[in-house]
């Protein structure tokens, strides 16, 4: 089996641009280069037409009206615009916000900033499987709660929250509901109407589109109001000023159009790859899958291998592009805050690999990855005195380690 290395298995960090998407983008860099806001000549009209076509394709994937799509630079900006924008607009009604401890940093750090500005935030914990307890959410809601922000698919462990049930709770209590769907679009069916979502963040580069472009869905009926965070020429109905990057928008539109069309075949492909990988690592002892396997994005596996250091494992499998945690925070050697929230101890949180498959991943690559990981785990454990003690039946928790 000859597999070209390194094998890319980090599709939750970013995806390659689909060739069909790249082809669609190129003319808008050189020939059709007009500014979509130039409404006095054909160059501008052609560009605007392309932007509106993309807007419609993005809206179609999430069952929205094209008028509800606001272009941004990515999901981080969309999260900021949604959360700060709604919090500041509705602050006369109350200053209490609710989110979850396992959210992406783009949501958590935005919430922290609002706390500095005098808002109060409740951070909900999750159960061992990574899902929130809906009763706990209901209990956290107060009369002055104005916004709830909960991600659809977790970027580290891939668990899928029960978004329609949460949407129902928010609508009943007349609270604005924001969902970070950066990892959900193209992996699970997304329907803003059925799930009663008010604000939804999207990114192109997680869906085989270009980096640097995203969108925010802003509900019109019942209307959700936001305070703009970026001021200027009043583009995007005043929500987000700045010249629209036609080529990137066209890329995002085409990527989302393909994602809608090929969702079923992509899903089947991911599940097949996941099964091959899980079968391939069968027989390794002390392996823990992090997060619920039922309620999960089909392309995500987050696995902890006990008695192996995550960093040394990543070095050992340098033929694979995998990560320990999210790309945004993998530079820090802190154990993953998401895994800690599941109740995993530091050792297990440190020994995890996030393996995420994509449209371009082949069965041979996954087979190769599983076999490589299996052999390296064996070698690394042979070097571990703790593994030896564990195999000898010694309860490691009962040992008192001497301080040097």
Swiss-Prot record:
Keyword Cell inner membrane: no
One GO term (biological process): [2Fe-2S] cluster assembly
Record-linked InterPro entries: Aminotrans_V_dom (IPR000192), Aminotrans_V_PyrdxlP_BS (IPR020578), Cys_deSase_IscS (IPR010240), Cysteine_dSase (IPR016454), PyrdxlP-dep_Trfase (IPR015424), PyrdxlP-dep_Trfase_major (IPR015421), PyrdxlP-dep_Trfase_small (IPR015422)
Iron found in the keyword field: yes
Annotated EC: 2.8.1.7
UniProt main location, coarse: cytoplasm
Subunit structure: Homodimer. Forms a heterotetramer with IscU, interacts with other sulfur acceptors.
Family, as annotated: Belongs to the class-V pyridoxal-phosphate-dependent aminotransferase family. NifS/IscS subfamily.
Biological role stated in the UniProt entry: Master enzyme that delivers sulfur to a number of partners involved in Fe-S cluster assembly, tRNA modification or cofactor biosynthesis. Catalyzes the removal of elemental sulfur atoms from cysteine to produce alanine. Functions as a sulfur delivery protein for Fe-S cluster synthesis onto IscU, an Fe-S scaffold assembly protein, as well as other S acceptor proteins.
Protein name: Cysteine desulfurase IscS
Species of origin: Neisseria gonorrhoeae (strain ATCC 700825 / FA 1090)
Classification lineage: Bacteria, Pseudomonadati, Pseudomonadota, Betaproteobacteria, Neisseriales
């Amino acid at each position: 089996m000859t597999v070209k290395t390194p094998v890319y298995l980090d599709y939750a960090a970013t995806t390659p641009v689909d060739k069909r998407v790249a082809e669609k983008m190129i003319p808008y860099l050189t020939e059709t280069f007009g500014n979509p806001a130039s409404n006095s000549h054909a160059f501008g009209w052609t560009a605007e037409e392309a932007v509106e076509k993309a807007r419609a394709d993005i809206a179609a994937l999430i069952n929205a009206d094209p008028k509800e799509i606001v272009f941004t630079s990515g999901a981080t900006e969309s999260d900021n615009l949604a959360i700060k924008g709604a919090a500041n607009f509705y602050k006369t009604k109350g200053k209490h916000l609710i989110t979850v401890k396992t959210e992406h940093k783009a949501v958590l750090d935005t919430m922290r900033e609002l706390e500095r500005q005098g808002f109060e935030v409740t951070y909900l914990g999750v159960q061992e499987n990574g899902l929130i307890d809906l009763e706990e959410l209901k209990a956290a809601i107060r009369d002055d709660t104005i916004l709830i922000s909960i991600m659809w698919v977790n970027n580290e462990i891939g668990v899928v929250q029960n978004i329609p049930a949460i949407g129902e709770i928010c609508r009943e209590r007349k609270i604005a509901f924001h969902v970070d769907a950066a990892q959900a679009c193209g992996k699970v069916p997304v329907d803003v109407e059925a799930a009663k979502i008010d604000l939804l963040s999207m990114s192109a580069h997680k869906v085989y589109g270009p980096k640097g472009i995203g969108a925010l869905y802003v509900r019109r009926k019942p209307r959700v109001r936001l305070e703009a965070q970026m001021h200027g020429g009043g583009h995007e109905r005043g929500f987000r000023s700045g010249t629209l990057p036609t080529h990137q928008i066209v890329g995002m539109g085409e990527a989302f159009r393909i994602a809608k069309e090929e969702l079923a075949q992509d899903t089947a492909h991911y599940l097949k790859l996941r099964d091959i990988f899980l079968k391939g690592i069968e027989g390794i002892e002390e392996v823990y899958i992090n997060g619920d396997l039922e309620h999960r994005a089909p392309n995500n596996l987050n696995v902890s291998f006990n008695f192996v250091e995550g960093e040394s494992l990543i070095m050992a499998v340098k033929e694979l592009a995998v990560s320990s945690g999210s790309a945004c925070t993998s530079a820090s050697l802190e154990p993953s805050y998401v895994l800690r929230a599941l109740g995993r101890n530091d050792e297990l949180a440190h020994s995890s690999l996030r393996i995420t498959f994509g449209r371009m991943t082949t069965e041979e690559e996954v087979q190769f990855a599983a076999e490589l990981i299996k052999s390296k785990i064996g070698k690394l454990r042979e070097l571990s005195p703790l593994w030896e003690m564990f195999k000898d039946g010694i309860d490691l928790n009962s040992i008192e380690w001497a301080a040097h």
